[in-house]
Amino acid sequence: MKARTEEIVARRGLATSEIKRGPGGIRDVEFAVQLLQLVHGRNDPQIRDPSTLGALSELSEAGYIGGDDATKFADAYRFLRTVEHRLQLVEEEQTHQVPTELAARQHLARVLGFRDDPSSTAAEKFDQALHSCQRDVRAVHERLFFRPLLETFAALDVRGQDERVREEAPEAEEGTVMDPAAVAERLAAFGFADLSRTRAAVSELAGGLTRSSRLMAQLLPLLLDWLSLTPDPDLGLLGLRNLVVQAHARARMVETFRESPEAARRLCLLLGSSRALAEYITHNPELIGILGDDGELVPTPREALVAEAQTRMRRRSGKARQRAQLISLRQDQLVKIAARDLLGIDDVPATGVALSALAEALLEAALSATCVQVPFCVIGMGRFGGAELSYASDLDVLFVHDAGDVDPADKASVAGGEALAESFLHFVHGPNPAQRVVVLDLGLRPEGGQGRLARDLRGYATYFARWAQTWERQALLRARVVAGDRALGERFLAMAASFVWDRALTKADVADIRRMKARIERERIPVNEDPQFHLKLGRGSLSDVEWTVQLLQLFHGIPGTGTMATLADLVAHGALEEADAEALSDSYRFCERTRNRWYLVGALPGGGSPADALPTQAHQLSRLARSLGTTPTALRDEYRKVTRRARRVVERLFYGIDLWE
């Protein structure tokens, strides 16, 4: 019932502003107090006060709730009731929703006694106090919900043990033991679907009489609380259990939890969000220690990553072992990037930059392992060139080598360039997917899959002058040097810029771009993915935004590799209205954030990426929505809202108007 109430509130977008039924609100206090009375009041007539504050006092005196928790609940309850009363006086109606309008919230804050000062407004002080109160209430509420469950599990475990262990184990009070149906219902309310697995995991986590076992037993209510807030609590609990059964991992985990409860909270979030992350952390428990320190989670700069990669590789001989070092570094860094993403520390652009810097560093280090004897560089294209990678992105690249004064058609020169490219690709891709450092895609090279892997500068110049198509001008907008010989790369970019900008865009060029975009819309969405909710190729989604920006760039002569930054440049140059840029930006950010999150939530260890559309299966959509802090219905509604608004801009600017008018 409580879960349904909260779902209704969340569906209406009132989770933080609804002070009565929302998380951390008045009902959380009342539900928790009434639950404790129901569990313990059957055998203890001293805790049956009908008033919430009176019952809290009795429960605290009887030891059923800690003194600190009782004080937090009582203070929060008084504050929330005061807010409720003042709100209803101000609004002159029966309401429990804090106004979203700044002026109304400022007025309410002043009625409550908050005042402006040089550092913050009354409304800001009220918001801070309210959010702090809701956070405290929610934490205590959920901890109390789980305590009877743990006592029941402990009692059941004691009954199943032999007499020797039974004498050493604390007996649970008869009144605290819940029947199996009640236990299952309580667990389901917090997202735990598997009763037997939950009980087994709890026993593993808190079993034994060692100091670490006692600490885990004390932390369990809090751990279950944190896991209940993740997309998949059962998965998170399994991840904790898998760590505990490894002696070295258990010791590190308990030590970290003792020193940093914040690391414990963050670990629960990661384990309950992503199966792939959970498996990697299980095999590399030393990563647990960095989770509690924001400084440790800061993305490592590109040059420092290159240095670390090269240091790791020098410690190993042989290509396979060196490749394994790069894979290990990639996975370590992905945990940090994903943690910052899931914790809300980084936004979409910051995540894209971090993923791109990591990819650049891996390629730079890989080049040093392939014994390149002539100037050679890697040009990033597409999202890689724009430093806007997602977790699911392949790396679009071109290879450039310097053949000196040799004729670009010379067979020896061509063979030498191909040999360099093949050696590099063989090292990076490895003999199988498990030994792959990154996935490189050379589909944008001249002549596509039929063309040579690498060309020298004159070879590219000849191709651009004679055979290049309009789409290749568009693709080169995002070209950027990402690894290898920088001087050579800059010479390539200068030549590419001449090809892109020296000739004005014609109506035939625009028609060509529009035809290709229309064909992609018709042909590229896989049959098993929902076109109505496609995050990459759907109407008004990522591809629409990128193509519209690039068409405007070519027409107005505005360079730029990144979509989001270029949107701002287009506005600054008067090539795009601010409202249109906002619509495109909102859709891009929403779709990219959702796509990234679905990759983390839906990807399997060692498996391929999940689809680029919102999942169609209800349980998958629910997990994704929970990870994004919303509901399945609200997530679909938000997709429709932002993409329809963006599509209207795309229809007008990309397909509709004559750019020359």
Language-model segments: residues:
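A nucleotide- and high-energy phosphate-metabolite-utilizing enzyme signature
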Residues: M1-E661
